[in-house]
From Swiss-Prot:
Gene Ontology biological process: intracellular sterol transport
Domain VASt span(s) in chain numbering: 403-576
Designated gene of the protein: LAM6
Side Lumenal, residues: 652-693
UniProt protein name: Membrane-anchored lipid-binding protein LAM6
Keywords: Endoplasmic reticulum, Membrane, Phosphoprotein, Transmembrane, Transmembrane helix
Organism (species): Saccharomyces cerevisiae (strain ATCC 204508 / S288c) (Baker's yeast)
Length: 693
């Protein structure tokens, strides 16, 4: 019975809608009002359709007529004043359907009117024709309501100093962005990152510095779609945008934080909606476009009628299946107005405006910073190579396997290419000149560029200098001829430089040459440099002083390498600084691979090394030095205890010798001892009077 009634009602509404459409298009507002007041359904058929049967099949007749005492019909009384006695209009029929579908039809003694929801308190249950009329006029009071709600939301901004620090921390922000407050929390990705969340009037930002890595997160408020309290964590808040979902936890007072974020977020969204309505109105006036009645029927939404039933009744949505396709026009007209006036279902105009507004303020971006070592502005060098790489590799050449003596293998806080430019600079070889002067060298010729090419296609350069010799016999100085060959130069992988030094003025000087190899590569983090130095003596003829020459060369190379390390540290400290570079992509942690194969760089998801942090190699060296220092102190203490123990044993030994001597000569001591005759008892008498003492 209920299904038949709904189908009949749908047919009646379809006829009513088809009849009102041409009248509205021709007569405008006045024609629509006259038609609504003059047109009515047949009362008998309407009553038949609107009566909801009870459990026993009886049909209650109360509650169907409009009267001032019935609050559920108060919204339509003003429209139906002239037609109460003549029959119920289509407007009354629509409203009565809403009430009938919201009533369960139970006859348990509870009045059916008490169960009906109030139409006046629910904007989504407003009557169809009232909605159509409101669409013609584009009610301005709805915009005023939005504006008033925005004005009523009061927030207190942070101080100017805090706002200045906030803008320095998050620079790509709109000029009108102001900080409201910030909270300590954890940002969850693969693992929680400790930091602070910053709430402004336009953005929700997060900054973290954990494990020497840094991340910054900026979420425009107008891109946030949902805010929720995480049920599994009593201190967590979930923020969801169109593309991502972010979880923050560790709030001391989550409810207060959630309430403030929600208020600011609501204010931003309401302001955007109000701006959209004002812009649309100005554009319409500027172009001379008026909201004609025909536009209501041509620009309706495409929402299904079952959504309308689900929002106006507590009954299951399956009742919508009994409605005809033409009934959707009623829902479309209602939804078109609700969507346009800023209900939770966003209209296309508001979506496009929101997207354009978000593009002007920047999208939700997460960017990372990594530590890099750069040249200071006062550095006399120029370097245009990479400061960080994603993949590193070991040296493809092994000096140990080629009978070369390794002098050094150490890490420096500088990119390999930058260290190479510093040590073998072509335009300003200040480092090499300083190093040669520390080795008692003079008369240094011009150190040019690697423009010469040998038969193997390798670039090299040559220069000469005079070196003082400190040998007890032989010449006091010698001329040194140096050829520096660039064997391999790839700033993203490794660099190999071979320095050949000949000393023709020394004994057997034409029979040998000293060859020093300098190899540069990236460290495992892809930020610093591993410098490896080795040497060997290359003989082209035999010599009877070969062992002595090799020994002197080795000692001289070891001493020169120590001076070289000190000079490198001075130059790095003077001309290199720790800086930050924006990381576009991040790679996973490196894996230990075989010799010569590429490996991933240690680049965690959030990156920023603090300036005061030490490189790993320096930390290890300092730790080893402290261990050696503790070891030396332990040895000293043990040595002192051993000396004291030895002294005590010597003293004890002397005492034992004395006791032994006494035991050996005890008879002689007794024989030479003087005997004393001590009487056992001495009698004393009291002197009498007259005795002379």
């Amino acid at each position: 019975m209920w299904g038949d009634s709904m189908r009949e009602l749908g047919d009646a509404m379809d006829n009513e809608l088809n009849a009102v459409k041409p009248v509205v298009e021709e007569g405008g507002m006045d024609g629509a009002r006259k038609f609504i007041k003059g047109k009515s359904f047949q009362k008998s058929s309407t009553e038949h359709m609107l009566i909801s049967p009870g459990r026993d099949g009886s049909v209650p007749l109360n509650g169907l007529k409009s009267s001032p005492a019935d609050p559920h019909l108060s919204d339509v009384n003003s429209i139906l004043d002239n037609h109460r006695g003549g029959g119920e209009t289509a407007l009354t029929s629509v409203n009565n359907i809403i009430m009938a579908t919201s009533t369960n039809g139970d006859s348990d003694g509870v009045d059916g009117d008490a169960k009906r929801p109030s139409i006046s308190n629910c904007s989504s249950r407003s009557s169809f024709f009232d909605t159509v009329l409101s669409t013609f006029s584009l009610k301005s009071n709805s915009q005023d309501t939005v504006t008033n709600e925005v004005k009523n939301i009061e927030v207190q901004f942070a101080s100017e100093e805090a706002n200045k620090k906030f803008r320095q921390m998050f620079k790509p922000l709109a000029p009108n962005t102001r900080l409201i407050t910030d909270y300590f929390c954890y940002f969850h990705r693969e693992f929680p990152y400790q930091g602070r969340i910053y709430l402004s009037n336009t953005h929700l930002c997060f900054n973290s510095t954990v494990l020497n890595w840094m991340a910054k997160l900026q979420i425009p408020l107008n891109e946030i779609k949902y805010l929720d309290k995480v049920t599994t964590n009593s201190s967590a808040i979930s923020v969801e945008t169109v593309t991502n979902r972010y979880t923050f936890s560790g709030f001391i007072a989550r409810d207060e934080v959630f309430q403030l974020i929600t208020r600011v977020w609501s204010k931003e969204n309401l302001t955007n909606i109000n701006d959209v309505l004002e812009v649309d109105e100005r554009v319409s006036k500027k172009k001379g476009i008026s909201s004609t009645p025909s536009s209501i029927f041509n620009n309706v939404s495409t929402n299904a009628y079952n959504d309308f039933i689900s929002t106006t009744t507590t009954e299951p949505t399956s009742r919508a299946s009994y409605m005809s396709e033409n009934d959707m026009l009623i829902e479309e007209a209602i939804r078109s107005v609700d969507d346009y006036m800023g209900t939770p279902r966003a209209s296309p105009s508001s979506s496009s405006s929101s997207s354009s507004s978000s593009s002007s303020l920047g999208s939700s971006t997460t960017y990372y910073c990594r530590p890099v070592y750069r040249l200071k502005p006062n550095a006399p060098f120029q370097y245009e190579g990479p400061f960080h790489v994603q993949e590193t590799m070991d040296f493809p050449y092994k000096p140990e396997a080629n009978n070369e003596y390794v002098l050094l293998e150490r890490q420096f806080s500088v990119p390999p290419g930058l260290l190479f430019i510093m040590m073998f600079n072509e335009d300003n070889p200040v480092f090499e000149l300083s190093f040669l002067k520390t080795q008692d060298s003079s008369n240094i010729s011009h150190i040019g560029t690697f423009e010469k090419v040998n038969k193997d296609g390798q670039h090299y350069r040559e220069f000469q200098y005079t070196k003082q010799l400190h040998f007890p016999v032989g010449p006091k100085s010698t001329n040194c001829e140096v050829a520096e060959i660039l064997l391999h130069c790839d700033w993203e992988r490794y660099i190999n430089v071979l320095s050949i030094t000949r000393t023709p003025n020394v004994p057997s000087g034409t029979s040998f040459s000293t060859r020093t190899r300098y190899m540069f590569r990236w460290d495992d983090q892809g930020q610093g440099c591993i410098l490896k130095i080795s040497f060997w003596v290359d003989w082209n003829a035999s010599s009877w002083i070969k062992p002595m020459v090799e020994s002197n060369c080795k000692n001289g190379q070891i001493s020169a390498t120590k001076d070289l390390v000190k000079l490198v540290e001075e130059f790095v400290e003077k001309y290199v600084e720790l800086s930050k570079e924006k990381a576009d992509t991040l790679k996973p942690l490196p894996s230990v691979t075989s010799f010569g194969s590429p490996r991933k760089v240690a680049a965690p998801e959030l990156t920023m090394v603090q300036p005061e942090s030490k490189p790993e190699a320096e930390a290890e060296i300092s730790e080893i030095g402290s261990d050696r220092w503790r070891f030396n102190w332990v040895n000293i203490i043990i040595l002192v205890l051993l000396v004291l123990n030895l002294l005590y044993l010597m003293k004890l030994n002397k005492k034992m010798d004395k006791l032994t001597n006494l035991m050996t000569h005890k008879d002689e001591v007794v024989a030479h001892a003087t005997l004393l005759d001590i009487p056992a008892k001495v009698q004393w008498s009291r002197p009498r009077r007259g005795d002379v003492l």
